[in-house]
């Protein structure tokens, strides 16, 4: 439980501190999702339930698809603007 909380807080901290870099924001979101998946997996192992393990595998597959789509959008954004930095006004 403590490891998942630490991972989730690292993800939140990375997201908050790197507001101008889209790649680091995506990595931070993936770290938070990994923490939640790890919590579901550990909880299902403690309760000896296979449904939680199935959910964890499903979440990992969806996260992989999400990352691929996000990076594809990021490449298109870079080709359009020439930069991936976020500008706040």
Curated annotation (Swiss-Prot):
Coiled coil: none
TM region(s), chain numbering: 1-21, 22-42, 57-77
A Pfam family matched in the record: Oxidored_q2
Membrane topology reported for the UniProt record: Multi-pass membrane protein
Organism the protein comes from: Podospora anserina (strain S / ATCC MYA-4624 / DSM 980 / FGSC 10383) (Pleurage anserina)
Enzyme class: translocase
UniProt-listed NCBIfam families: PRK05715.1-2
GO BP annotations listed: ATP synthesis coupled electron transport
Function (record text): Core subunit of the mitochondrial membrane respiratory chain NADH dehydrogenase (Complex I) that is believed to belong to the minimal assembly required for catalysis. Complex I functions in the transfer of electrons from NADH to the respiratory chain. The immediate electron acceptor for the enzyme is believed to be ubiquinone.
GO cellular component: mitochondrial membrane; NADH dehydrogenase complex
PANTHER family given in the database record: NADH-UBIQUINONE OXIDOREDUCTASE CHAIN 4L (PTHR11434:SF16), NADH-UBIQUINONE OXIDOREDUCTASE SUBUNIT ND4L (PTHR11434)
Gene that specifies this protein: ND4L
Known EC number: 7.1.1.2
Catalytic activity: a ubiquinone + NADH + 5 H(+)(in) = a ubiquinol + NAD(+) + 4 H(+)(out)
Principal cellular location given in the protein's record: mitochondrion
Keywords, sorted A to Z: Electron transport, Membrane, Mitochondrion, NAD, Respiratory chain, Translocase, Transmembrane, Transmembrane helix, Transport, Ubiquinone
Family listed: Belongs to the complex I subunit 4L family.
GO MF term set: NADH dehydrogenase (ubiquinone) activity
Full protein name: NADH-ubiquinone oxidoreductase chain 4L
Reported impact of residue 85 to S: In strain: A+
Compartments in which it is found: Mitochondrion membrane
């Amino acid at each position: 439980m403590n490891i998942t909380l630490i991972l989730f807080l690292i993800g939140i901290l990375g997201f908050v501190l790197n507001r101008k870099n889209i790649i680091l924001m995506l990595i931070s979101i993936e770290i938070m999702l990994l923490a939640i998946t790890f919590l579901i997996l550990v909880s299902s192992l403690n309760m000896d339930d296979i449904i939680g393990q199935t959910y964890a595998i499903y979440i990992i597959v969806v996260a992989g698809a999400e990352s691929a789509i996000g990076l594809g959008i990021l490449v298109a954004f870079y080709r359009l603007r020439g930069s991936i930095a976020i500008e706040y006004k």
